[in-house]
A protein has these predicted regions:
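Membrane-interface "cap" regions at the ends of multi-pass membrane proteins
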Residues: 1-43, 49-57, 63-66, 180, ...
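Terminal cytosolic tails of multi-pass membrane transporters
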Residues: 1-7, 372-400, 419-476
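Loop-to-transmembrane helix boundary motifs in multi-pass membrane proteins
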Residues: 2-11, 124-126, 217-221, 225, ...
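Hydrophobic transmembrane alpha-helices that form the core helical bundles
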Residues: 31-32, 51-129, 134-137, 282-299, ...
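Helix-loop-helix junctions that connect adjacent transmembrane segments
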Residues: 36-39, 120, 148-278
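TM-loop-TM module centered on a large, flexible mid-protein loop between adjacent transmembrane helices
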Residues: 71-72, 78, 110-114, 228-290, ...
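Membrane-helix boundary/coupling elements in multi-pass transport proteins
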Residues: 88-102, 203, 208-215, 271-311, ...
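Membrane-interface loop-to-helix entry segments
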Residues: 119-174, 187, 204, 227-232, ...
Length: 476
């Protein structure tokens, strides 16, 4: 069907996945796990990425609304959980924007050899936030240059970092012990396990392309293929970049904030290559936030239309149907969060990147847990709907394959938030406080938003599913 609108090509769909899912800033915390990161990457590809990707492929090709994961959870579990995950999905985004904004002043300082004071830093942070806001006002199909360009630059940065790391190791030897034993998981290393959530986080985002179905030429064909091709490509890119970082910098010295940048600086010094990679890295941050804004804003808007998020998220709809109200709220919240840098507590003001980024990750991971039981309910209550792509397991095996990623998500959240040693208390307590406060705010938002709702959806029943199918067939 052609409606005369510009459509996303399959190449752009792949680029969108890479632009959304692959985030350069997450490579360093994963590399901080040490050589055992390779075990965990392979293990989580098999036990998390594959079942998660196949669930998203089935849901995305079966239910093609622009609400994405929100629609799936609402249909599977009802308004209560639909409201919760829409809030979790949304609140992760301004936290993420704010965390990335804090990287800009320091990296610019490395490039130009200057050191910014706190006021100048916050000014640069805010400039990043509001440029992202302006980029988020453009529809996905009209921003192919952002998606394609962002993907190309991200891959280029990762490949260059990996190649430089290998070259450095060949010239100077590996910075880490490369014996076989170091590649096995060390379950007693609680500090390293705290970064496992980063690897799972690095797989998140495939569902964002499912909110762009109206912009795709053939979503039923493109979504499953893009998830498979994009997922495998991203895993290879991460492993290569992580190897490069680990080759040049010892695991216990990798900075979770600027690890990739410091690795390049260790290899090539303050050369022009270093400066170019720094600038390219900063450009990828803009591309990443722009790509995510399309999905996050659509979910927030859809939820608000059902009385599951505040009405402000349905305001300021542009001529090309962009929810600019949601976009504006993102920028305002991110700007306010950045003021935490003014708090005169060292663990907060100096550890702001990981505090915000880690909390963002927790909320994003929390979003996906209800998706798996919702998937089971939709399979049970909507069995007659045509499924172009089908999750390949059935019965008890299917339940096991869905339970494993749920358990991994819960464990990753616990490992990120809970301090398992005295040394972690100072860094993790602020994260716990922010998480609890935002979680409680989310419950208030859910209850208040529901007051304007005339009826409550309890999730699809077999009768409602049959009725919906009949209505859709009449429309066709």
């Amino acid at each position: 069907m052609s409606d005369g609108k510009k459509k996303l090509s399959f190449l752009t769909v792949i680029s969108t996945i890479i632009c959304v899912v692959f985030v350069c800033e997450a490579a360093a915390p994963a590399a901080a796990i040490g050589n055992q990161q390779f075990f965990w990457w392979i293990f989580l590809i098999l036990t998390f990425l594959l079942p998660y990707g196949m669930v998203v492929a089935e849901l995305g090709t079966t239910y093609d609304g622009e609400g994405g994961i929100y629609d799936w959870v609402r249909d599977g579990l009802g308004d209560k959980w639909g409201a919760r995950i829409s809030y979790y999905y949304w609140v992760n985004y301004p936290l993420w924007i704010a965390s990335l904004a804090t990287m800009f002043p320091d990296i610019l300082g490395m490039v130009f050899g200057v050191e910014f004071n706190l006021i100048a830093k916050i000014g640069i942070d805010l400039a990043f936030v509001w440029i992202v806001y302006l980029m988020g006002r453009s529809k996905a199909a009209d921003s192919e240059w952002v998606l394609n360009g962002g993907a190309i630059i991200k891959v280029a940065v990762a490949v260059i970092v990996g190649a430089l790391g290998i070259w450095y190791a060949m010239e100077n030897g590996f910075a880490n012990d490369m014996s076989a034993a170091t590649f096995l998981p060390e379950l007693t290393n609680t500090n390293a396990l705290g970064y496992l959530s980063i690897i799972i986080f690095n797989f998140m985002g495939f569902e964002v392309i499912c909110t762009m179905t109206d912009d795709m030429a053939d979503p039923a064909r493109d979504i499953p293929k893009a998830i498979i091709v994009g997922g495998l490509s991203i895993a290879v890119i991460y492993l290569f970049a992580g190897f490069g970082i680990g080759a040049a910098v010892s695991a216990d010295s990798i900075d979770p904030d600027y690890g990739m940048i410091y690795a390049v600086q260790t290899i090539v010094g303050d050369s022009m290559i270093f400066k170019v990679i720094c600038i390219a890295f900063l450009i990828t941050l803009f591309a990443n936030m722009a790509a995510w804004s399309f999905g996050v804003n659509s979910v927030a808007r859809y939820a608000a239309e059902h009385g599951n998020m505040p009405k402000v998220f349905t305001s300021m709809i542009s001529d090309d149907d962009m929810p600019n109200g949601a976009n504006l709220v993102n920028a305002i919240v991110a700007s306010l969060v950045l003021c935490l840098q003014l708090v005169p507590i060292d663990a907060i003001s100096n550890g702001v990147f990981w505090m915000l980024f880690g909390t963002s990750i927790v909320f994003l991971l929390l979003t996906y847990i209800p998706m798996f039981p919702a998937f089971l309910n939709l399979r049970k209550n909507d069995p007659n709907r045509e499924r172009i792509f089908t999750f390949p397991f059935k019965g008890a095996m299917m339940k096991v394959m869905l339970a494993i990623p749920c358990i991994e998500l819960i464990l990753a959240i616990v490992a990120t938030l809970i301090p398992f040693s005295v040394d972690e208390i100072g860094d993790k307590v602020p994260m716990i406080v922010i998480f609890i406060v935002l979680l409680l705010i989310g419950e208030v938002v859910r209850v208040v938003s529901a007051k304007g709702r005339e009826t409550e959806c309890k999730g699809l029943t077999p009768e409602l599913a049959a009725q919906r199918l009949a209505e859709e067939s009449e429309e066709d």
